[in-house]
Structure formats: structure tokens, C-alpha cells
């Protein structure tokens, strides 16, 4: 998917935490156990000691590129981080307009770009978790290394629009939050609320894809772009991940839906262009 070169990007919608490097003391399980034993022997509240120990100090690399440099669509066509800025801008522009037509005010949600680990409102965010939306602070968290992992670990073909699909999916969860339908139900299975919620986010991503060019940031997606998104959706299907990691499929453990389901609901969103039709 190509950005219009003269599109003006708003990098303020992306928080860049990639230049930060931890320099503090990491408390391992053994150290924690020692602290607990000593505090109990001394009759001291162990939480007072644990809270007093510095667990994270950070430094910033001033020479690192930041998203503040992302000004135009031309920048987005050249740099991956600027591409994410452009996707975030286009996604939020669409949802601002789409929800307003139905009488709902959309609240902007920043994306936090980080490397390896960072602190989120929902706890510690690590690259192993993959991209996610945190309803506690209303932010999307993304380590750009995930896109390489999408290909090497999950077998996706990758590409710029696979990235767009991932970002749009996470913003789908923010839209659910805005609409008051984001659930914390942890039950699993093909018909679980958890799976339906993920499939709805896929559908919302498809809806945005249908209207992406209307925002002024992007050119209309090509069939290659759509195929890339569908390929990425299938790559993170529960059945495919289970088959590749354990050699068997256990539907009762699904949390995100099968490859076929994820492709189906992205396609539903794209074909209808109507988010009110996203009802798995």
C-alpha cells in the first residue's frame, strides 16, 4: 500500500520509546525471596522494601531516529516507523469520521513504539507478547521487530500491508472500547466472547481497509495488498499456531479464532465497508 507523497503526517499520535534503554536493577525471583525472608525476620512489611528498590531507570539515545521526523507520506514510503505513523493517522481519521456519523465521539489513542520491553498501563509490555491494545491507558503497544517475527515465526509473507492489518486490528480493539463493547472475558473456544471479539477486530480492520484511501493518506489498496492482509490474518490463526507448535489442533483453547475465521471476518469488513455488520 502506497502513501500519497504530499500527505501531512501527525507524528504526535505515536509515542516513540525505542531510544530508551534500561539501566536499573532487575529484581529476579531469588533476590525477591531473600528480601521477603529478611523482612519477615525483621518484622518489616516486605512491600515497603520491594517498592523502595529501583527496578527501572532509563536513558535515551539522542542520536536515534524518532517518529518526530515523520512529516509526509513520502517519509512513510521510505521508513517503516513513519509508515506506522501514517497508518495510525489514517486509521484514526477514518474512525473519527465513521463513528461521528453514528453519533459516537471517537477518542484518539496513541501507539507506543518500543524495543524489547516497556511499561504499559496493563503491566510490563514485552516483544514476546506481540502487539496489543491496553484499555487501562488506552494505548496500542508495538515492537517493530514483530513484523519480522510474523514472517519467521508465523510463516506470513509480510509486507507493508500486513503491517497495516496488524495496526488496524489493534485499533479495532480500541474502537470496541470506545463503543463500550470491549470485554475482559477470558473463556476460550471457537464460540467464546474472546474469539468473537478478535474476529470483530479483524472485521473492523477490513472495514478500514475499504475506506483507507478516503482519508487522503493512502492510495487505494491493490489486490496484492488485500492478499497480504489475508495471509497475515491466517498466519496468526489459532489452529495454524497450534499445529505448528504442538502438532495438534485444540479448538477448546482458541482465543483468537482459526485462520479461516480470521480471513472470513476481515473479508466481511472489506466487502461491506460497514462496521455495523461486524457481528461474529
Residue ranges, per PLM feature:
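Post-HExxH zinc-binding segment in Zn-dependent metallohydrolases
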Residues: 2-17, 191-217
Amino acid at each position: 500500500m502506497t502513501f500519497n507523497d504530499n500527505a501531512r503526517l501527525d507524528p504526535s499520535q505515536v509515542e516513540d520509546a525505542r531510544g530508551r534503554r534500561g539501566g536499573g536493577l532487575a529484581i529476579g525471583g531469588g533476590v525477591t525471596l531473600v528480601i521477603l525472608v529478611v523482612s519477615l525476620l525483621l518484622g518489616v512489611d516486605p512491600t515497603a522494601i520491594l517498592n523502595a528498590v529501583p527496578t527501572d531507570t532509563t536513558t535515551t539515545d539522542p542520536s536515534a531516529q524518532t517518529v518526530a521526523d515523520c512529516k509526509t507520506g513520502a517519509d512513510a514510503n521510505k521508513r517503516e516507523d513513519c509508515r506506522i505513523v501514517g497508518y495510525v493517522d489514517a486509521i484514526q481519521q477514518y474512525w473519527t469520521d465513521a463513528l461521528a456519523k453514528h453519533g459516537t465521539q471517537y477518542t484518539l489513542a496513541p501507539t507506543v513504539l518500543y524495543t524489547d520491553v516497556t511499561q504499559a498501563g496493563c503491566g510490563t509490555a514485552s516483544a514476546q507478547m506481540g502487539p496489543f491494545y491496553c484499555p487501562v491507558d488506552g494505548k496500542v503497544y508495538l515492537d517493530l521487530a514483530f513484523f519480522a517475527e510474523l514472517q519467521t515465526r508465523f510463516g506470513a509473507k509480510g509486507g507493508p500491508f500486513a503491517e497495516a492489518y496488524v495496526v488496524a486490528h489493534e485499533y479495532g480493539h480500541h474502537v470496541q472500547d470506545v463503543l463500550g463493547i470491549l470485554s475482559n472475558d477470558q473463556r476460550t473456544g471457537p464460540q467464546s466472547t474472546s474469539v468473537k471479539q478478535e474476529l470483530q477486530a479483524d472485521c473492523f480492520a477490513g472495514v478500514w481497509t475499504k475506506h483507507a484511501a478516503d482519508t487522503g493518506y493512502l492510495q487505494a489498496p491493490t489486490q496484492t495488498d488485500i492478499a497480504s492482509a489475508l495471509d497475515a490474518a491466517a498466519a496468526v490463526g489459532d489452529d495454524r499456531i497450534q499445529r505448528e507448535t504442538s502438532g495438534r489442533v485444540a479448538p477448546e483453547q482458541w482465543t483468537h479464532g482459526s485462520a479461516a475465521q480470521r480471513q472470513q471476518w476481515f473479508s466481511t469488513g472489506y466487502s461491506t465497508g460497514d462496521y455495523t455488520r461486524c457481528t461474529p
